[in-house]
Amino acid sequence: MGGGLLEQAIGMAGFFLPRGAVIVSTEGRAVPASSFRAQTNGEDLKGRLVVLIDESSASASEIVAGAVQDWDRGVVVGRPSFGKGLVQRQIGLSDGSAVRITVARYHTPSGRVIQRPYEKGKRREYYLDHLRRYDDAARDSLDAAAPAYRTLRTGRTVYGGGGIRPDILVEADTAGFSNYYGELIRRGIVADFVGDWLDGSRDSLSRRYASFEAFDAGYTPSDEVLERLTALGESRGVKFDAEGFAVSEPLVRMQLKALAAQRLFGTGAYFRVINPAASPAYARAVAILEDWDKSGQPVLEP
């Protein structure tokens, strides 16, 4: 889950919650407290539900995850979210510009503050806190210091302190990542290559694969495609690293295939390629959904 808008978050969470259930509330020093509730009975009140989050999940996506978790409606899987939950008011200035003032913070239904703490003069600490969410030992220390709350249906313990902490923690798979591949990404070489490559290959791929299913089952980027990518890297000053490339080759092929699928069949096709192979959290979510009575429902009990 990425970021998003408040209205969409309320609508999405409301799909799974009963009428009147608090989805999110706001409170500020000079702003009256207010709550946003589900306006109708959700269309899916009892179905199996898993919400995926990670360090990039922010704002509206945290509202959805927090509401689902606090009402014990579904299982939250992945890694701690970013922690971005501020209400801002825009004030127009005479020269046509504007300034945004933070006036309140978002709270989950159990009362947890979504926004990570940001104390005056501690900007560096704020960003270090985000980095710690990638580190096992540091994350454990954050959890130990986090205030405890109770969910609203079964009374399970959940933790505040900023962001949403998943019910089931699944670490990122970094086995296929190398410094060499990271350098290709950081310099924009992969993005530039993909655009040129797909511009020249789209028609032939479309003729060969009429459906996503056929593409997914039959297509793998060739060695020649990978050689063109590394050659572009060389021309941009990224020296070829055979060892690093060997580590990242499966990841590179999968990423290129997913991007080709996106160009041919839409954004959803990208995730249909990338998630099963590259996301341990996605695989865990599927396993939970398939064995809900043993792997999902018990998580929601006290």
Predicted regions and their residues:
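Gly/Ser/Thr-rich loop/hinge elements
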Residues: G4-S59, L86-G92, H107
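Conserved functional hotspot residues or short segments at active or partner-binding sites
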Residues: V113-I114, Y118-P302
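Polar, glycine-rich mid-to-C-terminal structural blocks
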Residues: A60, D72, R79, G83-A148
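Hydrophobic alpha-helical scaffolding
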Residues: G2, V50-A58, V75-P80, G92, ...
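Conserved short loop/turn motifs at secondary-structure junctions
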Residues: M1-G4, Y270
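Sec/Tat-exported extracytoplasmic proteins
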Residues: G2-G3, A13-I23, E27, I53-S57, ...
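Terminal peptide-recognition signature
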Residues: F16, L49, V68, G111, ...
